[in-house]
Structures are given as structure tokens and as C-alpha cells.
């Protein structure tokens, strides 16, 4: 006999996230430093006592300084993720890497449709941290930093959910499905669909009903959708579209 369970997922629309860097409409400001967006989501780790945290950093081409070399335009920038203790008394660890970009035309470098998404994951001990993300343009040496608290929870085997990740596109090919995260969390009045990715962890095969609730904080309206899921033992990947 299958066990029927009720899971609850809540999504706020219209609010700014702690981990989100907001854009300025001042074009001079945009060119002064590499403005970026960052998002993070927690998942069950394969390592005992750890939680895997995925980080996505999105940098628009228009916010990085490109240099023409030959027939192409090149740019690069450094990303630094610094993990502090909750009280910022010490650095737990730091990760630094370089991203390289290329464009075929000057128009590409200034297009607001072009951006680069960096992806890194770390297996971390559950707890409260403070995270500082710094993006530095390699050519101009100008940088932008963003700090925010990071609360990493323990994810259990019996029945649990990962964090929600807002996605802009789901790509299907011969290798399966892949997602494009909506790192900037851009939702406009032209958005007709809203998709989220999450993982459900179960220690047995069972039927679960997921209650998705989306709240528009501007008008106070709630949108509810009940989604039945035939869970298999282990990791169950779910893409839900409102």
C-alpha cells in the first residue's frame, strides 16, 4: 500500500532576494564596475553530514570591459567567494577563479541579451554563514562585492526537499533535460510561464502530493497548484511550471 504524503512548497514573487544584486538604470554606473546577480540553492550531498550548495553568478556582457584583439573582442573577470563564520570572526574558506569571454562583434559586447553564468558547488556543513561574492574586471581592475547571510540546512533521506531554483528554460535533447537558471530572477508582465526546479528525496517508493503556493506580494494574491508525484527511492528531480 502506498503512503500518501503532503509536501508544501512556497514561492514569493515580487520580492528581492538577499543574494540578488539589483541593476542600476544609470549606464555610466553599469560601466564603472561589473554588476552581477548571484543565486544559491541547497541539495542533498553524497558526503555524510554535508549539504551541497550550488552557486550561480550571472554577469551581463555589457557590464564587462572587452578589448579588441584581431577579429574578436575578449574579456575576462575574476570571481571570489569568501565564506565567513556567522559572526564574521574568521574566514572558513575561499574560492577564486577566472572567467573568459569572447565576442565576434562590438554589438555583442553591448547587448543586454548576452550574459555569462558561472557555476560552482561546494559540500558544506549545515549551519549559518556569511558569504561575500566579489567580481573583478581583469582589464579595468574595478570590482563589485555583495555580502549576505547564508543559512544552510540539513537535508534528510526519509522525505525532504531541496531549495527551489527559478529557471528560464528547459532544454531537452538526446542526453536528457538540462535547465537554464533565472539567476537575476527577472519576472515581468510579459512572462507567461514560471518554472521552478527542485529535488525530492525519499527513502522508499511512495506517492506524494506537492502543494505549490506562489504569492504575489504586490497584490497579496496566492496561486495554488497540487501536483501528484510518484516518488522513487533516492533522488527525484521535478520541474514544475505555473
Task: Name the predicted role of every residue range.
Residues 20-242:
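Intrinsically disordered, low-complexity terminal regions enriched in Ser/Thr/Pro/Gly
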Residues 3-15:
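Sec-dependent N-terminal signal peptides
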